Amino acid sequence: MINKIIFGYLILVTLVIADDYTSQRGMTNLLGVETNLRCSQQMSNPKAKTYELSYKRTASMPLSPFAGEYKPKFLPEIPWAGSRQVFTMDVLNENVNDGNQGTQMDALGHFGYTDEIWDGDGDADLSSLKYFGKLNGKEVKPTPESPLKKLGIESVPPIITTAVFLDVRKHIFNGKAMKAGEYVTVQHIEDTIKKSNVKDRGILPGDVVLINTGWSDNYQDPDDLGIYYTKAPGVSYNLVKYLSDKQVVGVGLDTWGVDTFAEEGEYGPERSQNPEGIANPAHHYFLTQSGVHTLENFNLKDLAKDSVDLSCVIILPLMTQGSSASPLRPVAIGVPTT
């Protein structure tokens, strides 16, 4: 009986959406009855616990280098020097870009790309700018100061689905945190699944995938050392395509960028997989090609401690019209196995 009540509630939550954004969505179009039912099975388990997946938002937490104002103000497209990529961002208050601070998710309109590499000098040529679904720059962001007219965070539905937690720190790196410049590979993920409680299930269409690298050991509040945002491990380009082929809805790490950031000489050999002219290959493929949302600064410590390899995750971005990202308070409901 409880399972039926929960199932009915989840269907109602999914259906109560004022506008039809299906044409602007990627993998979130897979959310529905099947993913709700999978979630209800986790939520109705009497041994299930609720886990906070966000960090407390404070003035002393690690701050993104992309901070800005906190009063609605929409910035022009921002080209990435040495890259064909262009990203969009809106700011709220001075020194605080709320959508890109703390635990957050990106809208599909957060990144676009051009035909030619911008060398960082002069104004970038945005005439070839494209976004997810091959939408051109003027369709998504008509003027430099405008909000996103398509692919904004308001187009993202409530994400209520099963989350597969993959602890590569535990199963691949013997409990040691990954280093900046290292990549999580397809082999790492496949080996982790074989060693985890989802070995018979694997990754299903509509899942969220959460990957624990251990980099969050550097997330300190107050952020006296200032290490966290300087660099990070991330996912390899082949893994990005692998997870996209699995038709996952979102991919989150305990890092600030999903992509890999490091000093020259620190990157692993998997860097050679990256396409030419793409500075942030995970953001590029997930957001502009496959329609998978990037989930950042997720607090996965409790899931790791309790080995919650499968859970129901609830991710509700703010419906800030025209914004390219949103702060989150995601939760997971699942059964501890340790």
Residue ranges with predicted function:
Residues 1-3, 338:
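A positional/structural detector of protein chain ends, strongest at the extreme C-terminus
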Residues 3-18:
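Cleavable N-terminal signal peptides of Sec/SRP-targeted secreted and luminal proteins
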